[in-house]
C-alpha cells in the first residue's frame, strides 16, 4: 500500500545543506498499522510528510496505492491525495465551525450534494463517537474530542491510508489510550492502512503491527512489533523498550544501598526479560545450579505484539563466585542484568 524507496530529503539554509532523511526505504502492507518511532529531530515528521508529498523528497520514490506520487503532475497529485488522510499533534480545527461543519469541510470542497454531505457526516460522527457533539464548537471540546473530530474529518473522503503525525502527543494518558483504541477500531472495521510516527514506545506497543526506528534521518531497525520487543537489535530500540517499563527502588532499599560490594552485602539486580526468557524458570534454575537465594523486590510485565516482556528487581544472596556464575547464566539466556548496588 505504501512503499518508500531510497528517500533522501535535504534542506538548504544559506550555504548549509541539512540532510533530514538519508536513503530511507520502508513498505507498509494494506490494512497494516505501521509505527515509526524516534527521538525529537530524528526526521519522523519529515518522513511522514514525504508520503503525501507535503515535503517533496530530494531523491527517491513514493508509491501509495500502486501510484508513484513523485512522478504525478500537480492536478493528478491533488486527486491522489484524496486517498490519503492525515491527522496532526495539533488538531487544526476551524473555531468558527461546529463539529459537523469541520467534518463536512472536505466534502464541501469536493462539491458533494448537501444531502450526501449530511449522511456522510452523520456516519463519521458515529464512527468517532461524537454523535452528541455535532452542534458543539471546538472551544467547548476536550483535547481527545478535538482529535476525534480531526480523525472524522480525515476520513471524510474515504481514504485508503491514514497518516498520523504525533497524533497523541498533546493528550493525557487516558485520552491517548482512547484515541489509540479508536484508530485500532477504524483499522479493523474499515481495513484502513495507518502509518503513524511517535516518540512513545507505548503507542507502538498498543496498536502497531510493524515498527521502524529512525535516528538522525536513517531507519536503523525495522521489524514486527513482537520481534522487536523480543530481540531488539540496536541500543536505541532497546532504550525505547526500556522506557515502557520502569521500577523504582523502594525507599528503604535506597537508604541502605552501597555502590561497592563488601562482605555481608547482597547485590540488588535489575533484570530485563524478553521473548522466551520471560516464561522460563530462570531464577529457580540459578538457585538450584549456583546455590544462590533470590528475593524478588518488585516486577512489572507487559505484552506487545503477542509477546510478553518485563523487568524485575531482585536480591541475589550468595558468595561472590556463585553470584557471578548465576548472573552469567541469566545473561546466556537473554536476560539483561544490571547490578544497581549492594545492601
Swiss-Prot record:
Coiled coil: none annotated. ATP binds at residues 38-45. It is found in: Cell inner membrane. It is a peripheral membrane protein. Belongs to the ABC transporter superfamily. Methionine importer (TC 3.A.1.24) family. The keyword Nucleotide-binding applies. Its EC number is 7.4.2.11. It catalyses: L-methionine(out) + ATP + H2O = L-methionine(in) + ADP + phosphate + H(+); D-methionine(out) + ATP + H2O = D-methionine(in) + ADP + phosphate + H(+). Residues 2-241 form the ABC transporter domain. It comes from the Bacteria. The gene is metN. Its main location: membrane. It is an enzyme of class 7 (translocase). Gene3D superfamilies: 3.30.70.260, P-loop containing nucleotide triphosphate hydrolases. This is Methionine import ATP-binding protein MetN. SMART domains: AAA, NIL. PROSITE patterns: ABC_TRANSPORTER_1, ABC_TRANSPORTER_2, METN. One of its GO terms (cellular component) is Gram-negative-bacterium-type cell wall. The complex is composed of two ATP-binding proteins (MetN), two transmembrane proteins (MetI) and a solute-binding protein (MetQ).
